[in-house]
Regions:
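Transmembrane-lumen/periplasm boundary regions of multi-pass, lipid-linked membrane glycan transferases
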Residues: 34, 41, 46-202
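Alpha-helical transmembrane segments of multi-pass inner-membrane proteins
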Residues: 7-14, 55
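The feature captures the transmembrane alpha-helix scaffold of multi-pass secondary transporters
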Residues: 29-33
Length: 209
């Protein structure tokens, strides 16, 4: 799981550099190598999650057309799946339909809340969205405690703007962020959202954050 986190984090960094330095021209070999290795460690999440984060980031930039974004994600995805596909085909030939059923159940069954009769072991904690935030809060102890104590020092003032104006101002501030900060924020939100979808999860899935 630490290995998966390493490949995803470095892969995200390479995706960011691809846009920042090359403006999506060509696909650096490091991207398919890193994402491919991420797939081999933990399954399709190694490609889906980084490209999901990167796609949202590109949309937030409003610098490229939808077609350019789609082509960039498609090229990165196809090139990244080549290496894992060789391993999956070899494993399928060795394990047959049993391997295929278990692989589909582990990677897609719990994500789409489907029944997984071929799995006879625990896939993780079946808790609500709150579990992700509780795990993150526990992981940042003691800083979480200091954060909650600091809330008592806040001075609240009656807002001079309407809720709509506040939301619009917040959105504009996000859009005007430096690219590094915007990418970090998008990654944070997308990863939390992504891991809130599966019907079961485990605490180490938050290592990417």
């Amino acid at each position: 799981d630490m290995l998966l986190t390493t490949f995803i984090v470095i892969g995200l960094y390479q995706l960011y550099r691809w846009e920042d330095k090359l403006e999506l021209k060509g696909v650096p070999i490091a991207i398919p190598a890193l994402l491919g290795c991420a797939v081999l460690t933990k399954g399709p999440v190694g490609i889906i999650l980084p490209l999901f984060v990167f796609g949202v980031y590109l949309l937030m930039l409003r610098k490229y057309s939808y077609l350019v974004i789609f082509k960039a994600l498609l090229y990165a995805g196809i090139s990244s799946i080549f290496l894992p596909l060789l391993w999956y085909v070899a494993a399928w030939k060795q394990g047959g339909d049993t391997f295929l059923n278990v692989m589909l159940a582990e990677n897609f069954g719990r994500f789409f809340h489907l029944s997984t009769p071929d799995i006879h072991y625990n896939l993780g904690h079946e808790n609500g969205v709150w579990y992700n935030f509780m795990t993150l809060a526990a992981g940042f102890v003691p800083w979480t405690i200091f954060f909650f104590f600091s809330l008592f020092g806040l001075k609240l003032h009656k807002p001079e703007k309407s809720v709509k104006e506040i939301l619009a101002s917040t959105w504009n501030n996000i859009r005007s962020m430096e690219k590094e900060k915007l990418f970090s924020l998008v990654a944070l939100v997308c990863i939390i959202f992504f891991y809130s979808i599966p019907s079961s999860t485990v605490s180490y899935t938050h290592l990417t954050l």
